């Protein structure tokens, strides 16, 4: 998430210290303005490296879903392709073909039908992928509604989603003037409440978002049940509603670990899916993917033809120029690991998560909210009947003193009084690190 910075964020000491023994030893470098003259490359390198010395260790950051390790060969390939602009497909046709292969591999994992014209694209991350999926839903809804004679200006269009949504959906609804209808979570329904979700749907609903890996807890929405509810609803109305699956976390994990779960394009009313390659696709940030089951669900007006890079290039993106290196990194992982390799990595991750959940539960202080048996996320709260003089926020601070970053936070709307702590187990977090933790 990009933060906003300005004058108020400047530090009181506004110069950088020079490097001992260098020719520039007496030259202070300003922090917030350009220096007047160049410095030697090694000076610039060392000054900046020194600024980063006291940052947290990314491997010990159990707050983030983002991948923090890749093999040296992958890193080498990515560093060798940093200068390639992914959007310039006529200049880099082999890179474009690699992106095409990745889309088709993911489509196969998500059971896209060869009888439908599925299509997809890479993105900067799942946030952009969600934006694209949301825009496609909005434009497709508008086209259908206008054909049916609905006054689309009479009310705001709306999007239905669990209150456990990731912040990108709030951004989407704000940026594109959509009413966000959130279905409250409770301790009984720690995912999308299937008993209530359809109460939020009407003729102005652009779509329903199901989540495969709720950010707060790691739980899955029951997409198969949601599909059945939508199917029944659509039988009795001309104003059809469809499902987008936000599988930022689960999209490149579930197919390898629980292939029998029905959540993807196997289900008739799931029309688009997004996933993060930089989560359980095992690539450094940032890379995401969004796919549609058929081109009929991606309105033509959202596809732009760009000719000024040489050749006419169709593009569906919010971002434009970006490095192709992350696409290359994703393809490396697909080639390197294959289906069995991804399964083995995720199985080890699963085993670590389950181990941690059991060990934390043995302490007798915590109630496990999510035990890592599906998505490898361990989430817990303090037991109501155990009196402690400390909070989960105190525990997070104490863990931070030893280098571990483990966030504590309240659950979303309707459960704000419940404070939890969450451990994200990634592919680079082995059993040895779990024992050390």
Regions found by a protein language model. Give the residues of each.
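Conserved PLP-enzyme active-site core in the AAT-like
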Residues: 6, 10-17, 121, 125-301, ...
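Structured alpha-helical segments in the cores of large, soluble enzyme domains
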Residues: 99-106, 165-170, 193-201, 319, ...
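Surface-exposed helix-capping loop/turn segments at secondary-structure junctions
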Residues: 108-117, 143-149, 360-369
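PLP-dependent enzyme catalytic core of the Aspartate aminotransferase-like
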Residues: 233, 415-437
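Active-site C-terminal subdomain of aminotransferase-like
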Residues: 256-375, 381-386
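Conserved PLP-binding catalytic core of the aspartate aminotransferase-like
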Residues: 366-403, 427, 431
